[in-house]
């Protein structure tokens, strides 16, 4: 079984995220329904990098080089179509991703020093002819950037504009053709805010989601999840799990999802378990003893508040009777979640029955 995990397919993403991959194919392979795509996915660098890597596997670069070559001659700037990848505004990386952007990073800039003018490309130039993946959080915080980007994608033309309205560009710069597909990623709240700001575009854009969990229906599905964890360990350059360590990780995954038949596909959760367990690993694989040590240390590290509740019971500041019997009184376990605390814990509560005369109304 361990050998099967090590010799898994290059990528399981297509099998574990079929809806998302179908949406990517609609955007990239088939005639585009819309140049924009919305994806519900955590706005973290690890997820954006994963999405960029999977998009590269589906994206087919154009037969001809995209972009132009800007020639600066004193105060005059001209452009010609790009002939080599070394041209200053030729597109060499068809898929670009960023979780936060500034105007200069997205659209490039014009620099002038000692009378010499230079043009610096931005993300839209490097992704010309391909795909640009951006975080909705960054665009919602800077609506002017979004309006300019949307306009350029719709018109298929990049216009050089000054970021400071009080200081125009020192020279006139010819516009360049732009062929770009944009994937906007965000959590549910960001998508809702974007839909309110752009209702028509949201209705026309291709939509899909990253599925956080995997329903374990049979042994094959469980094997796929184990292969997914193994591939994440290889990408992070961390040791894999030994055969006796898998039950503990599966149990912790079920505890995380709250369902014994559901396991997480969250790359951040998987990376955290592997990194913390690797700190105790002394061999080539992470063993069950090292997983258990990691979980016990984490419980102790995060268990201050839970221990204080236990101390109150032991010191009889919180009276919890565990012997004898009493009519109309019983105990329940309340789940306590403190803001900012990573772990929920249980607190016993006494519930007493109170009887009183009613007021005669239903």
Regions found by a protein language model. Name each.
Residues 1-201, 206-218, 226-243, 247-289, ...:
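Conserved ASCE/P-loop NTPase catalytic core
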């Amino acid at each position: 079984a361990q050998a099967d995990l090590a010799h898994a397919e290059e990528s399981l993403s297509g099998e574990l995220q079929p809806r998302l991959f179908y949406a990517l194919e609609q955007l990239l392979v088939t005639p585009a329904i819309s140049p924009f795509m919305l994806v519900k996915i955590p706005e973290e660098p690890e997820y954006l990098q994963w999405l960029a890597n999977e998009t590269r596997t589906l994206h087919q670069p154009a037969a001809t080089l995209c972009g132009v070559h800007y020639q600066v001659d004193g105060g005059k700037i001209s452009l010609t179509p790009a002939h080599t990848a070394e041209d200053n505004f030729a597109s060499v990386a068809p898929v670009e991703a960023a979780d936060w952007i500034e105007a200069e990073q997205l659209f490039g800039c014009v620099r002038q020093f000692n009378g010499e003018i230079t043009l610096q490309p931005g993300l839209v130039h490097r992704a010309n002819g391909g795909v640009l993946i951006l975080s909705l959080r960054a665009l919602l915080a800077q609506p002017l950037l979004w309006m300019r980007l949307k306009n350029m994608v719709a018109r298929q033309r990049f216009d050089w504009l000054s970021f400071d309205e009080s200081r125009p560009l020192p020279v006139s710069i010819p516009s360049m053709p732009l062929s770009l597909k944009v994937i906007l990623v965000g959590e549910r709240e960001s998508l809702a805010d974007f839909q309110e700001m752009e209702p028509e575009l949201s209705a026309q854009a291709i939509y899909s989601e990253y599925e956080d969990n995997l329903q374990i229906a049979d042994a094959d599905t469980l094997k796929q999840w184990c292969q997914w964890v193994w591939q994440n360990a290889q990408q992070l350059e961390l040791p894999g799990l030994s055969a006796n360590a898998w039950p503990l990780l599966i149990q912790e995954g079920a505890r995380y999802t709250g369902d014994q038949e559901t396991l997480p596909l969250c790359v951040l959760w998987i990376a955290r378990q592997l990194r913390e367990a690797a700190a105790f690993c002394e061999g080539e694989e992470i063993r069950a003893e090292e997983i258990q040590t990691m979980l016990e240390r984490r419980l102790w590290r995060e268990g201050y508040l839970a221990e204080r509740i236990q101390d109150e019971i032991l010191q009889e500041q919180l009276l919890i009777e565990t012997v004898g019997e009493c009519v109309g009184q019983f105990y329940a376990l309340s789940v306590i979640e403190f803001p900012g605390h990573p772990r929920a814990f249980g607190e016993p509560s006494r519930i007493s029955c109170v009887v009183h005369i009613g007021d005669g109304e239903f």
